[in-house]
Amino acid sequence: DGLQFPDLYFFQPKKIFLLKGNTVEIQYLNMCDDEVESDFEEITQSQKLNVKSQKLPINIQQRISKENYLKKTEKMLAHIHRGDIYEANFCMEFFAEDANIEPVEIYEKLNEISASPFAVYFKKNQHYLLSASPERYLKKEDEKVISQPIKGTAKRNLNIELDEQSKMDLQNNPKERSENIMIVDLVRNDLSHTATKGSVEVEELCEIYTFKQVHQMISTIVSNVEHTTSPIEILRTTFPMGSMTGAPKISAMQIIEELEETKRGLYSGAVGYFTPTGNFDFNVVIRSILYNSENKYLS
């Protein structure tokens, strides 16, 4: 693990700047609420940070050769044919050593290319996450819990007719639909652990959402929970998200642990927040760059 990210990290922010459309909502803890005006003045008078990194070449390497990857894929298929699992999300790492990047600049470029609803720029000491994730893992709004797994991707096309055809092909692709529905069943089971009786429901099945670069097949599964149900318990009984493991979840995870070359770390994990009222919203960490600025390791 060249990144050396912590497995788990939470913090309580003293100061929050919450962007809502064209407005900014500022929330400070009582211990520092007397700093609001001075902070606001400093921000409004500051110049835009002009970050320009040196264009040094980065040598991206693959963690496993194509030949060995295909051999491991055959082993994965053997598990499927034997009935151990129905599907699995088999990942490999692409990485660079001695990489010098400017994280802010890279993040801005990444999200110019692929504007995503669950994008994240996160820094903890020397650790950076630059994410263009389109996927929600789990959200809680009062008594309602929402999961939106993604399975199924199709490239956009500049030609309107071809773009629409790409969308329709994805909608009707039996392989993509089958994979999506398997994960829907898994999520329904996960949510049932904390749901009130009979409340688990599929609101959207294999719907096509259009993003800047791709069309995605997304399903929406919801449940209701008692107001006394712990948010931690809801996360504990659903994590990790099925879209990044496969089904059945535990069997898929055991096989992934055996066949993948490196630990995933924060990749295929989640970033999100809790509110003081017990609500939360977490994404899926995919389509992301992870970077350790101390040892210059990029993944």
What does each of the following model-derived ranges do?
Residues 1-299:
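Extended alpha-helical targeting/anchoring segments
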